[in-house]
Amino acid sequence: MSSQEASKMLRTYNIAWWGNNYYDVNELGHISVCPDPDVPEARVDLAKLVKAREAQGQRLPALFCFPQILQHRLRSINAAFKRARESYGYNGDYFLVYPIKVNQHRRVIESLIHSGEPLGLEAGSKAELMAVLAHAGMTRSVIVCNGYKDREYIRLALIGEKMGHKVYLVIEKMSEIAIVLEEAERLNVVPRLGVRARLASQGSGKWQSSGGEKSKFGLAATQVLQLVETLRDAGRLDSLQLLHFHLGSQMANIRDIATGVRESARFYVELHKLGVNIQCFDVGGGLGVDYEGTRSQSDCSVNYGLNEYANNIIWAIGDACEEHGLPHPMVITESGRAVTAHHTVLVSNIIGVERNEYTDPTAPAEDAPRALQNLWETWQEMHKPGTRRSLREWLHDSQMDLHDIHIGYSSGAFSLQERAWAEQLYLSMCHEVQKQLDPQNRAHRPIIDELQERMADKMYVNFSLFQSMPDAWGIDQLFPVLPLEGLDQVPERRAVLLDITCDSDGAIDHYIDGDGIATTMPMPEYDPENPPMLGFFMVGAYQEILGNMHNLFGDTEAVDVFVFPDGSVEVELSDEGDTVADMLQYVQLDPKTLLTHFRDQVKQTDLDDALQQQFLEEFEAGLYGYTYLEDE
């Protein structure tokens, strides 16, 4: 593939921007993965890797996870803050605390811990805190405890502090402080506390409710003052060491981040005036990733990079400190999405394709109803040279005629054959109009979008949207989707992707298309009998954890892929995926009991013994098989 062709494909799918140097198109037109851009010779052809795994028995769909991407993301964020601190003369430390709610899988947590980079862990529930405490011995032991807390949660955190870890119990509700003080006295431990301030600043987009005065979490200004006095009266004011705020999970606009940090810096200044020695400044999450590759302020993009993010935070905090003669606090970010999103790709196979094929239409019978004649006359007019009617008018006339035919069919005025002929002719007319439209003509763009959606191939993909990409369904989030091969060809077709659940919501509605978003996906020409595998990229944050069991489709298989500079690749199975039996047990349906009931039914039939045994074996094999569709 020429460099010009490769450049065009990169622009079509915006790979150069959302791929972030981890994903690229190689000379074969295949997706290439480079888990560590600092070691460019360590890369793997993803299409070839998947096919090799399939030959060894790998089932699809499957998650292909690249732990080296996790580690590179962590290094990159740490490096950005190091540069920012050096640039602005900032004397405080920086610490990334990974919020495990983003992806609690052991492979993720341990890959980050073993990266060799400074790392803390954040918990938002008792279960998460137990996981964090168990792993705390492997890292520098900074632990941040967020979320609602009962007595057991608080005791666990204090036990961690008693064991020598730095555990910051962030006060989110005033009711928590009394329990903290009681249990700290019982355990004879000095608590290490933080306060989450509820800012007036608020971001925009899908996660804007995390910030602002109506936020679910955090203390208002009056409550912050009340907390300070409560701790002062208890002789524990020195325990309040961390200031925390959180604007949202995916902040698209750097201006919103800068505004929030400046406001929170005022809290830092005012708390010091009250005698509170705040030592840590936790700006929470918000560091977004560019799912679209548009570098914009849209909900699924960001208009900044790591360096600009770090610069804005360090400058704003440092400036407030310099103005008021205060020490530079340690800065903490809880950048879970930015660390994990890129490292996982869901790969699946297309199990069926419904394509709109175009044939040369034949004239209707001479005595055909008027609506059929009208449709045919419009078709003929479209092919006459010098016609003065617009493309839009042709399209509108044909749509009205087809509508009349559908109405007439319902009342018996048209036969099934006549309806089929009309629909096929209308399809050909749409195709003819589509060929003559000019994307550069602003007036044509709505028609282009309408026809692309109408004419797109329907691709039925072996996956559950609800299990593997729940945010695409729940909040209409966009993820990069494209074939793993065939990217050396011009994307002349359009497609929509449908999952295998029995739910009309199981469809992807938005796709990357150059610098914009479309309702259909650009596709290179392909063999409908042997369609390409598809990759769903950047699903490493939240998707595995939020996935649900709609239609009892379970977790997919997952493999960890390690790529080395000599070209060698090491693959480890990290999750075997759920069986049908696993999913049935989740809903209190015992597989053994079901097998017994099925066996009883089979025995009551008049089938011969061999057939009965065959049916029983097939049922039992299905119970312990994959929940997704499998090739025979």
Swiss-Prot record:
CDD domains: PLPDE_III_ADC. Substrate binds at F281, D282, V283, G284, G285, G286, L287, G288, V289, D290, Y291. Pathway: Amine and polyamine biosynthesis; agmatine biosynthesis; agmatine from L-arginine: step 1/1. InterPro entries: Ala_racemase/Decarboxylase_C (IPR009006), Arg_decarb_HB (IPR040634), Arg_decarbox_C (IPR041128), Arg_decrbxlase (IPR002985), De-COase2_CS (IPR022657), De-COase2_N (IPR022644), De-COase2_pyr-phos_BS (IPR022653), Orn/DAP/Arg_de-COase (IPR000183). GO terms for molecular function: arginine decarboxylase activity; metal ion binding. Coiled coil: none annotated. It holds the Pfam family Arg_decarbox_C. The modification N6-(pyridoxal phosphate)lysine is found at K101. PROSITE patterns: ODR_DC_2_1, ODR_DC_2_2. Keywords: Decarboxylase, Lyase, Magnesium, Metal-binding, Polyamine biosynthesis, Putrescine biosynthesis, Pyridoxal phosphate, Spermidine biosynthesis. It comes from the Bacteria. Its EC number is 4.1.1.19. It catalyses: L-arginine + H(+) = agmatine + CO2. GO terms for biological process: arginine catabolic process; putrescine biosynthetic process from arginine; spermidine biosynthetic process. Its cofactor is Mg(2+); pyridoxal 5'-phosphate. Catalyzes the biosynthesis of agmatine from arginine. NCBIfam families: PRK05354.1, speA. Belongs to the Orn/Lys/Arg decarboxylase class-II family. SpeA subfamily. This is Biosynthetic arginine decarboxylase. It comes from Salmonella dublin (strain CT_02021853).
